[in-house]
Structure formats: structure tokens, C-alpha cells
Amino acid sequence: RFKKIRRLGALPGLTSKRPRSGSDLKNQLRSGKRSQYRIRLEEKQKLRFHYGLTERQLLKYVHIAGKAKGSTGQILLQLLEMRLDNILFRLGMASTIPGARQLVNHRHILVNGRIVDIPSYRCKPRDIITTKNKQRSKALIQNFIASSPHQEELPNHLTIDPLQYKGLVNQIIDSKWIGLKIN
């Protein structure tokens, strides 16, 4: 995980740790001129590791985004940002996207009153995301919300009620709120 961060830069969805400033300088000295292929590969790998996708999953999202009207890159990022695991991470209910995936896989999360155990579930506007009514589920989410440092950085397409452990998807994400810097 730390080798990936050192190579690709900060990936907030993967871990809260940041690469040291000196490690970036060493990589620049060693690398020389970066080819177009290398730049594209690094950007693709950033997407994969940040959102926790396999190569095949990313290809499916690219295919869906290519069929839709509009900029393929923007639509791809919107599709990835509207995944349930990413929305839990953005709401502060999980510290990382892999942590959010674990919450979903262990059936702690309800969407519109139904248990959803698929992290790639595509959320829609007006979806209500809550925790199960069990003490264990609420305790897990409460720990994440209490330790979440980015409470004030909540994107405008999401709202959270930390007392009821409830989040709401207001609309499809705007491109300026996407947390990952991609070329």
C-alpha cells in the first residue's frame, strides 16, 4: 500500500497517510522524461487503487461512460463517485474506501431500508443510507464519524445526520467535488 502511495502520490481513498516530500524528489531524479504511455498508466492506476477496482471492473465503467452522452472522463468519475462504498467514505462513515467496502460486505448498511451487501451498488439521488438497527453496527459507524477529520468538507451532493447515523444523496456529484486529482 505504501509503495503505491509513494509511486502515485496521495490516494485519500486508500489510506489517510501521505507520501513524504523527499520521496517524490527521488522519483523525479530517477525517472527522467515521462512518456505519454507512462502518464496514462499512472492515472489509470490512481483510479484503480483509489476506488479499489480490478482491471475488469474499471473497463466496464469505461465502457458504460463511453456509451453515455457527454465527456467520457467526467461521466466515468461520476459513476465511480456514486458507488456505495465511496459515498460511505465521503460521508465520513468509514475512514477509507476499503473500510467502507468491509462495512457493506458485513451487512451493516441499509439503502432505502433494505440491506445492501454489494460495495459497487450505484446510488441514485434521494437514496437514504443508514446503518442497521443493531448496537454493533451503530458503534462501528459512531467510531468512524467521531474520528473523521473532514466533517466540514462534505460535498454538496451529500448530507449527513450523525446523530441518526443517516446519510442522504441529494443529487449526482458535481465535477468540482471529486476528491482525486486526475490529468
From Swiss-Prot:
Keywords: Chloroplast, Plastid, Ribonucleoprotein, Ribosomal protein, RNA-binding, rRNA-binding. The keyword Ribosomal protein applies. Belongs to the universal ribosomal protein uS4 family. It is found in: Plastid, Chloroplast. One of its GO terms (cellular component) is small ribosomal subunit. Residues 82-143 form the S4 RNA-binding domain. GO terms for molecular function: rRNA binding; structural constituent of ribosome. GO terms for biological process: ribosomal small subunit biogenesis; translation. Part of the 30S ribosomal subunit. Contacts protein S5. The interaction surface between S4 and S5 is involved in control of translational fidelity. One of the primary rRNA binding proteins, it binds directly to 16S rRNA where it nucleates assembly of the body of the 30S subunit. PANTHER family: 30S 40S RIBOSOMAL PROTEIN, SMALL RIBOSOMAL SUBUNIT PROTEIN US4M. This is Small ribosomal subunit protein uS4c. It comes from Sparaxis sp. (strain Lejeune 1997). It comes from the Eukaryota. Pfam families: Ribosomal_S4 (PF00163), S4 (PF01479). The gene is rps4. InterPro entries: Ribosomal_uS4, Ribosomal_uS4_bac-type, Ribosomal_uS4_CS, Ribosomal_uS4_N, S4_RNA-bd, S4_RNA-bd_sf.
